[in-house]
Amino acid sequence: MNAKEAKLRQYMPVDQNDLVELWSVCGLLRSWNDPLEDIHLCVTTPSSELVVADSAGQLIGSAMLGHDGHRGWVYYLAVHPNWHRNGIGRSLMSYAERWVDQHKVPKIQAVMRADNLPVRGFYRRLGYQDNDVQVVEKFLNERSKSSA
């Protein structure tokens, strides 16, 4: 199995269940984030895109992209564990970088958990660096507060 066997394409509604399952297998789901809401928001927002990697009809990877005009963001970068180290993640990130560049956004950033050392290493191998920005948060609804 390698990246040549996979095709990157736009997310389609028929992918929804398989995509959520992929995110689950990859450990990306959190109780306070409804993945269906995240998908809906992405596909209905003009400054975002959801791309998937498909091999013979099987969803094996994803990347959710967005930008605010100053920086592009990568969320839900996922590669099924059976496909790790086959170039799928690199292909998704190359796509993400081109997408951000085509939108004339000067910088791309990725979101990941600080303790996810394998993923942090992956990004470093692609030339990404830790930055000195500290993210703060505040939950604005009870559902999120009670689930965190």
Give residue spans per PLM region.
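Residue-level recognition of specific faces of alpha-helices
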Residues: W73-Y76, V111, F122
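Conserved beta-strand-loop-alpha-helix junction that forms the acyl-donor binding cleft
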Residues: A110-V119, E137-N141
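Short acidic, glycine/proline-enriched helix-loop-strand junctions
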Residues: P118-D130
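A short, internal acetyl-CoA/4′-phosphopantetheine-binding micro-motif in the GNAT/acyltransferase core
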Residues: L77-H84, M112-R113
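Conserved GNAT acetyl-CoA-binding A-motif
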Residues: V100-M112
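Acetyl-CoA-dependent GNAT
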Residues: A6, Q10-Y76, H80, Y95, ...
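Generic C-terminal helix-cap and adjacent flexible tail
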Residues: N2-A3, L140-A148
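Conserved acetyl-CoA-binding loop-helix of GNAT-fold acetyltransferases
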Residues: R85-R98, R125
